Design a protein with these regions (language model features):
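Conserved ABC ATPase "signature" region
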Residues: 68, 105, 116-133
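Short coil-to-helix segment of the ABC ATPase nucleotide-binding domain corresponding to the Q-loop/switch region
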Residues: 98-107
């Protein structure tokens, strides 16, 4: 039986009179690559932010290691996220006056790593993300793909339990998207739990568990084998499933 590393119970989120999430129950399992799909405005990103404690709930609970993070203080949430959650967004949010290497290193220094561990981990990730030539450049001096690979490195330098990724390839061309997705898939293959929000089928195919959100409610779930490369059967299963949901 799979172990749930994060559990949402009756998650409800409203902005004023507009209810975006309607009592969602959702477990995120250790080692899974979970994907949340849905049309624009369905509540995908809001669900990710609610599960990670970045958005306060209007109702419900979210448990991480038996702690109800939905009702935790900001100080408690900051400490919890620093060592347990990593985040990648469509925009990289890299610090503009720091090099890519410094951006990665800073995340380790403010996390749970010693100076020595931070240096070793930074060097390891720069090599893994193929950033050797770009590490000493500012974000404005590199390509979108290089910047996003640095953002992935920054997100995982503290070896988080869960990597939250909100449309990480949304602003990238096909080649750069493929590169970033390959990196996230390789991390998942080593046991990294991933929660990815996307509207892109190519990105969704990386998941082994795909959820479809419509009007703030999960209306479908598809289980796939662990991703091992492009596979026509996998693509057909996803297409048939999405067509059945009216995508």
């Amino acid at each position: 039986m799979k172990e749930a590393v994060l559990s949402g119970k009756s998650i409800t989120k409203a902005f004023g009179e507009n209810t975006v999430l309607h009592g969602i129950d959702l477990d995120i399992y250790a080692g899974d690559f979970t994907v949340i799909m849905g049309s624009s405005g369905s509540g995908k990103s809001t669900l990710l932010y609610s599960l990670s404690g970045m958005d306060r709930l209007s109702g419900g609970q979210v448990f991480y290691q038996e702690q109800d993070i939905a009702n935790a203080s900001e100080n408690e949430l900051t400490k919890l996220r620093a060592g347990n959650f990593g985040f990648v967004f469509q925009r990289t949010h890299l610090i503009s006056n720091l090099t890519l290497g410094e951006n990665i290193q800073m995340a380790g220094l403010i996390g749970n790593l010693s100076d020595k561990e931070t240096k070793m981990r930074t060097d390891e990730l720069i090599e893994r993300m193929k950033l050797e030539k770009a590490k000493d450049r500012l974000p404005s001096q590199v390509s979108g793909g290089e910047a996003q690979r640095a953002a992935v490195a920054r997100a995982v330098i503290n070896k988080p339990v869960i990597l939250f990724a909100d449309e990480p390839t949304g602003a990238l061309n096909k080649a750069n998207s493929e590169e970033v997705l390959n990196l996230i898939s390789s991390l998942n293959a080593e046991g990294q739990s991933v929660l990815l929000v996307t509207h892109d089928r190519e990105a969704a195919l990386r998941g082994n568990r795909i959820l479809y959100l419509e009007d703030g409610v999960i209306i479908g779930e598809l289980d796939l084998p662990v991703y091992e490369g492009k596979d026509k059967t996998r693509e057909e299963k996803l297409s048939v499933w999405l067509e059945g949901l009216g995508w």
